[in-house]
């Protein structure tokens, strides 16, 4: 399960990478956690291009009576996402890209959990495959999202058996394409990211507390 990630990349780099007209300046994020507002890229509401939006991390199904159900729906398994009632409609109609440049997983070591940080070898930005949903049963509508996961590659598997799906830039358009509504239409891109293009290292336990959101989170463990 992916429950923390980073987004430190400059706004102008993100705008170019995701083919957005602009990305507002934002504080670098070193410890993004569930229920927080997160940046997502989705098909433009006016029928063309892409737009950047801020959504709550933890998908709230449209049929839910209590929005707190989203607190635990931060990940969706790619293998079953087209079948699960919580995600079925979003998978067909509301896919998104979730910008990031690294993520954390925890491994058990000497009776404690040791956090590890994963990123691309070039340190650049990438996109998680995501879904988004609108919940309208409260006083104010809530838009929320979840990250798709798959089996871990050889870099992640020593720490965890699952990993978030990192999409290739050439597949961004295909993932956002509203005409591709079946799992078989996109199954080829919902795969583990190539291990040879990733690196990982253990970091200090400072990141364990989601209130800590600074460069110390990604410092190598000593």
How would you label these PLM feature ranges?
Residues 1-222:
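Short linear sequence motif anchored by a di-proline
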